[in-house]
Amino acid sequence: MSVVGIDLGFQSCYVAVARAGGIETIANEYSDRCTPACVSFGPKNRSIGAAAKSQVISNAKNTVQGFKRFHGRAFSDPFVEAEKSNLAYDIVQLPTGLTGIKVTYMEEERNFTTEQVTAMLLSKLKETAESVLKKPVVDCVVSVPSFYTDAERRSVMDATQIAGLNCLRLMNETTAVALAYGIYKQDLPALEEKPRNVVFVDMGHSAYQVSVCAFNKGKLKVLATAFDTTLGGRKFDEVLVNHFCEEFGKKYKLDIKSKIRALLRLSQECEKLKKLMSANASDLPLSIECFMNDIDVSGTMNRGKFLEMCDDLLARVEPPLRSVLEQSKLKKEDIYAVEIVGGATRIPAVKEKISKFFGKELSTTLNADEAVTRGCALQCAILSPAFKVREFSITDVVPYPISLRWNSPAEEGLSDCEVFPKNHAAPFSKVLTFYRKEPFTLEAYYSSPQDLPYPDPAIAQFSVQKVTPQSDGSSSKVKVKVRVNVHGIFSVSSAALVEVHKSEESEEPMETDQNAKEEEKMQVDQEEPHTEEQQQQPQTPAENKAESEEMETSQAGSKDKKTDQPPQAKKAKVKTSTVDLPIEHTLWQLDREMLALYTENEGKMIMQDKLEKERNDAKNAVEEYVYEMRDKLSGEYEKFVSEDDRNTFTLKLEDTENWLYEDGEDQPKQVYVDKLAELKSLGQPIKTRFQESEERPKLFEELGKQIQQYMKVISSFKNKEDQYEHLDAADVTKVEKSTNEAMEWMNSKLNLQNKQSLTVDPVVKTKEIEAKIKELTSICSPIISKPKPKVEPPKEEPKHAEQNGPVDGQGDNPGSQAAEHGADTAVPSDGDKKLPEMDID
């Protein structure tokens, strides 16, 4: 079973796998551990990753990047509207109202959903992992920003399904970093001790996230998170791009933003310049040849000037840091360390701001680029039964408060209540109780829209079906279980109606009490102390109490009333049972039919990419063969081909080369396969003659050595040398005969081959020589390597017990003499022989 962690970044992605030796970040086909989050669409196939990145400028309209933030967002979303001007490709509104990506693929215009494009990238990362692990990859853990909303998380989950992955957990990026940090720490405080508080700061290309975590031995608890969803490395790039657009506009009279390719080139150069300025404080040049209208442009920038231009961005670094301390109610002195990751934290001014705020040196013990993917791989290993990992519990938080809203018959209007407050532990479940006579709907929403980086606070609607009143017409008790799961996704996971049945007393009067207690126990196990706070008030004000209290009160009241009855009167007995209720939901998520369709389409596109790759490989094989043979015909193959054959073959190679760049530019795979076979029919005999000429002398030499060795053994045997005197004369004669035959065969073939021209096929082939060597060895080797028979040494006669003299006058004992006499006259058994020896010992 594979264990894979995927860091699905805005600009680049990383894949880590768990192996017996630990966690390893794997490299792609370009030997690079960083895979660009980029997909390019062509007339015949898709390019994904590094291959797509190289087409950003040449195929700008059909190369998609920066699509991560479109997950779960409507086309009318203000964020999407703001992003349009930064995109080289077109985005469109899909029939669902969501954002789609418009490209030309396979010679026709296509609209892809964000989930489909992300699935393409995930498929590529999956392929990379499979090529390294040499086995299928299914289970994985994928990272998402901690500020992702329910809709965005569901969208990423859909993308993983389209890619054929089973996502065990959507893991918040800062939580993954915290896991990578904490699981290897051996000096964490014990569970009963005060936890170690560590702040994790992650500033990537598109966003800025901060979390504070409490560590104990084998335990990680996220206390609070804060973020700036638009502050990242690309904002600093934009400062440079805008500066040089303005400078080059004045200096060279160029309107750079009117030409998307020029803008993309400038963006790439500005990103390089920003990275250089992180290590150099001096003036650095920026030069681009043939930038626009065949004009070369150049400019300079230094770190000091750059930081001045970024003052407003740097001012946004502190607020999230202050926010996590306020939320967690911690002081700066309570923070043990501040760990920074993410590419943008390499900017010196950013590091300085963070360090100054906490008043301590920053910790850089984690790999800034790979910490997230390593944390995801560790989480996948923890969840996988295939790996034994040190126990480490992870408690995350809910980033935004979640509330429920419903129609209240008692209040004749809407009622609502906060189910999960901000920074509530996750994953977590709660059981809520409602009193209803008919089906009802719960609307889940984020209760602080002002803090939400998303225009719509609505999460979903859940309709509880088949709710009926009790047999006496009263409202039924409905238990609803709500949950924030490991992915950070909210749902109403189940609903059950409690039916009350009254009957006469049976032989087991205590069963009702026991059932009630079990019911209460189950409810307590599933919920926190505040679970019942959002139950709906029943029709009668007197019943406005917690569920458990109502049950206990009603049972107690019933007993009190029945106490004064005559003994012969039968007591009423209450039994309860639960009935599961169906739930219908309205979500920002793809339905099963669309998921199946997109999965099928992804499979077709993968197959098309594979076929196109095979076609290109076949074409490249023809081109490679043409160049190889043309060079070798005038080189090492020159002696092995006649003048006429060389001229004919050379002409054929030239014709093939011209065909490749004309009619053969775009042909099916089989045409290239046939063309290569046609060329090899002319070239292979020449290549074979060359190879035979190279290998034949070596094999003849080996055969000659074998013959000499066996002749030497025969001579030694005839000279009656001790080493071979044990051999049978008939066997040696057999060796001599085989050796002489092999020598005659070799001399004959050598003479014929020496008379043969190199331009024709050889008289004897290497396979024949190898067969002769094998034949000679199989006959002679067993005979000459026959070992000498072992000469056994003469056996020593066993010593008798009577040879030992009497000890301490024992010889005078008559009994002893009798025993000795008996030993001399009788024939003892094996056991009897050993007895005297044992006595003497």
Swiss-Prot record:
Phosphotyrosine modifications at: Y89, Y336, Y661
N6-acetyllysine modified-residue sites: K53, K430, K680
InterPro entries xrefs: ATPase_NBD (IPR043129), Heat_shock_70_CS (IPR018181), HSP70_C_sf (IPR029048), HSP70_peptide-bd_sf (IPR029047), Hsp_70_fam (IPR013126), HSPA4_NBD (IPR042052)
Subcellular location: Cytoplasm
Keyword flag Magnesium: no
Pfam families xref list: HSP70
Modified residues (Phosphoserine): S76, S393, S415, S548, S757
In-chain residues carrying the UniProt-annotated modification N6-methyllysine: K774
Region (Disordered): 500-577, 783-841
A cellular-component GO term for this protein: cytoplasm
Gene3D superfamilies: 1.20.1270.10, 3.30.30.30, 3.30.420.40, Actin, Chain A, domain 4, Substrate Binding Domain Of DNAk, Chain A, domain 1
PROSITE patterns xrefs: HSP70_2 (PS00329), HSP70_3 (PS01036)
CDD domains the UniProt entry points to: ASKHA_NBD_HSP70_HSPA4
Biased composition (Basic and acidic residues): 514-533, 789-802, 830-841
PTM-bearing positions, type Phosphothreonine: T540
GO-annotated molecular function: ATP binding; ATP-dependent protein folding chaperone
Protein keywords: Acetylation, ATP-binding, Cytoplasm, Methylation, Nucleotide-binding, Phosphoprotein, Stress response
Similarity comment: Belongs to the heat shock protein 70 family.
Quaternary data: Interacts with TJP1/ZO-1.
PANTHER family: HEAT SHOCK 70 KDA PROTEIN 4, HSC70CB, ISOFORM G-RELATED
The name this protein goes by in its record: Heat shock 70 kDa protein 4
Organism: Mus musculus
